[in-house]
Amino acid sequence: KIPAIIDPNGPDGAPIGLFESGAILLYLAEKTGKLIGSNNADKAQITQWLMFQMGGLGPMFGQLGFFYKFAGAEIEDTRPKERYINEAKRLLAVVDKQLEGKDWIAGDYSIADIAIAPWLRALDFYGAREVTGWDNHKNAVAYLDRFLERPAVQKGLATPARPA
């Protein structure tokens, strides 16, 4: 299962293996005390938005990509594509509203942003910015730009070419 990690220095000094991006993000944030907020209220908000991505944004945007970019021409029934376009629009509006007056989804930069922003970026890969009304969501557009300007994000996106 990907993504997965093995932390040789897990809880109580024993190795631990984890899969699922949300579980990995939460584990690493709690272990390091970084990107998880400075109090229980912050942590609750960050966790809420992490779960929003895990249970809504990620699955729905993933299905949008499948039906809009990859399988759309092969499937005569237009209802799946329409459903995921509409759901992506709705979820994008939720993100945009949450970002009003904020730089990051839950206040300070956090694991919630690490989970959410890449799915917004995926709309470009899917060729679905226009159909989802991306340009009408100014807060989300500015948010993704801020995310992509972060040095760690740039480093992560600079993957080496695969050998031929």
Model-based region annotation:
Residues K155-A164:
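Terminal-tail/helix-coil boundary detector
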Residues K1-E82, N86, D96, I105:
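GST-like domain detector, emphasizing the conserved glutathione-binding G-site
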Residues Y84-L91, Y143:
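Alpha-helical packing segments of well-folded alpha/beta enzyme cores
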